Amino acid sequence: MKQKFKRAILYARQHRANQEVNESLHRLVDFLSTQDIEIFQDSDTAASFELKTPVLPREKMGEKHDLIIVVGGDGSLLSASRMAIKVNTPVIGINRGRLGFLTDILPQDIESHLGPVLNGQYNEEERFLLHTKIYDKENSYFEGDALNDVVLGRGSETHLIEFDVYINQQLVSHYRSDGMILSTPTGSTAYALSAGGPIMHPQLNAIVLVPMFSHSLSSRPLVIDGEAEIELYISKSNETDLRISCDGHESRVVKPGQKVAVKKNGNRLRLLHPLDYHYYDTLRSKLGWESKHQG
């Protein structure tokens, strides 16, 4: 049996401040109160929901046997992951979103699935994040992390943008396209998939680069070593500023002539699942794959 948990930290985003999320949060509080668990909420949760539980400062998280319980969709868990890796605290999700690739537990299964997890009966995965930096010769302008993907986009530019991709200081190619998606295996079922990228098992140590509407028909998704260091050199021929976003959340300007460095973050997300979780079951149900021969 694995680590049992002594404290639960409830996390929900303001973006998800609706009746369904509120109902699940209160149901969690009622259930956790019967489990000999100290109950706290994150500051983001307290700003949007009226729970009668104390706020645990983020610098205090991870000091005991803590578990972050996310209520919402995959976007909420992506947001929580950037906090969780800094305090080495595991995360599990209650799905109140749409697809729910990362949030395993259905609202009606809170008691039956979360109870065993609290008592040390769960599967734990480590998922890596990408660390991103925008810089030039003089300054560093932005640093951010992404569990799913880092996306270079056109911003306000109406034409194809131009940039060079280097991997481990070796030129890969010059691109003219709408942008580039750099995805982890976790993010391979998100934006990268819609752009034609491959589905990668989450335990692969790999990164996929997916060009967006490239001008070249030979420009295809490229799967590379997860330990590689990637640099995007933004061409000075671009007429306006471009944008870099991390998980579609943190978006920053990147100017012509600047560089974007992307590599694996040294810290990993500890993502928990109930014991009956299976990755291929999730793929089949979320993507609508057939479960048996129909002949």
Curated annotation (Swiss-Prot):
The gene behind this protein is: nadK
Q: Which cofactors does this gene product need?
A: a divalent metal cation
What are the catalytic residues? 74 (proton acceptor)
Q: Which domain of life is it from?
A: Bacteria
Q: What is its EC number?
A: 2.7.1.23
Asked whether the UniProt record includes Amino-acid biosynthesis among its keywords, one would answer: no
Family membership = Belongs to the NAD kinase family.
Q: Which organism is it from?
A: Legionella pneumophila (strain Corby)
Main localisation: cytoplasm
Q: Which reaction does it catalyse?
A: NAD(+) + ATP = ADP + NADP(+) + H(+)
Which Pfam families does the record match to this protein? NAD_kinase (PF01513), NAD_kinase_C (PF20143)
- GO terms under biological process: NAD metabolic process; NADP biosynthetic process
Key word ATP-binding present: yes
GO function terms (MF aspect): ATP binding; metal ion binding; NAD binding; NAD+ kinase activity
Please provide one cellular component term from the Gene Ontology annotations of this protein: cytoplasm
User: This chain belongs to which protein, by name?
Assistant: NAD kinase
Protein purpose? Involved in the regulation of the intracellular balance of NAD and NADP, and is a key enzyme in the biosynthesis of NADP. Catalyzes specifically the phosphorylation on 2'-hydroxyl of the adenosine moiety of NAD to yield NADP.
Question: Highest lineage ranks of the organism?
Answer: Bacteria, Pseudomonadati, Pseudomonadota, Gammaproteobacteria, Legionellales
